[in-house]
Amino acid sequence: ADNLDFNIAGDISECCPNVLSELTWNDLKIYQVKTGGKVIVNKIIYLQGSLGYGWIIDGENQDSDFLGNNRTIEFSRSNNSADNGNVLDVSFGVGYPFRLGSGQLGITPLVGYSHHEQDLRITGGFQTIPPFGPFPGLDSAYETQWNGPWVGLDLLFKSAKKLTLFGDIEYHWADYEAEADWNLRTDFAHPKSFEHIADGTGIVISVGGSFAITNRLSMNIDLAFQRWSTDPGIDKTFFADGSTATTRLNEVNWDSREIMLGVMFYF
């Protein structure tokens, strides 16, 4: 499940109010397919890569607007559906493998680069404050990209003849960019209503194990956790009359928890 949120201030100096608008996507359920590979070349170069694509099938969205500082005097809130959209994750890394204990323990320092996309949708509008209830036609989009290098450590332990345990930890630096289309806002331009730009960081941790069925085939389970956030950045709004306005993007936060079941082939 994934969660993502962002909030903006009333102006570029984080004033009046310091949180003007806040969007949250909570408990996004995602079906994902993923492929990846690891190879050691000439016993000195370790290469790894992965590609994953997922479909959002369920989730919740909240859109709140405030007149007072620190999320006070909330004058508008809608609670909406977020059961559509997709995600994309690409990562690759290279390192030098160290093998200890007759090869049972493997430790590999890594450097790499990753790219992550989220196409988040907002539908099924329901106005909570003021309590007007459901409203038709909501079909807004918020599309994100996190790109940048990372450093990490890959761990492997062959605990038995058929059982192998593994783990990874990565620290990422990211250029964050996002574009939104707020389809019901007639005063905004379409399909690009506003954009976000910021610098961010992230940490990715995964642990798992594989059980060998044959010499070339194993079953594996992988548990992964990610947490990303940005520094303050820029929110630039594009209006229907061609004008623009810039304010402070206070922060963007994204966390993800996943369980992956799969098969592994050895060549």
Walk through the language-model features, giving the residues of each.
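Transmembrane beta-strands of outer-membrane beta-barrel proteins
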Residues: 1, 48-52, 108-114, 168-170, ...
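Extracellular/periplasm-exposed beta-strand and loop segments of Gram-negative cell-envelope proteins
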Residues: 3-30, 53-89, 114-147, 172-206, ...
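Outer-membrane beta-barrel domain signature, strongest for Gram-negative TonB-dependent receptors
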Residues: 34-41, 46-52, 105-106, 218, ...
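Residues on the lipid-exposed face of transmembrane beta-strands in outer-membrane beta-barrel proteins
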Residues: 35-39, 90-96, 111-113, 149-157, ...
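Repeated loop/turn-to-beta-strand initiation elements of outer-membrane beta-barrel proteins
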Residues: 43-47, 102-104, 161-165, 211, ...
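Acidic, polar low-complexity intrinsically disordered regions
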Residues: 50-58, 91-97, 106-108
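Internal, conserved structured core segments that host functional sites
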Residues: 94-121
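Alpha-helical membrane segments in multi-pass integral membrane proteins
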Residues: 164-174
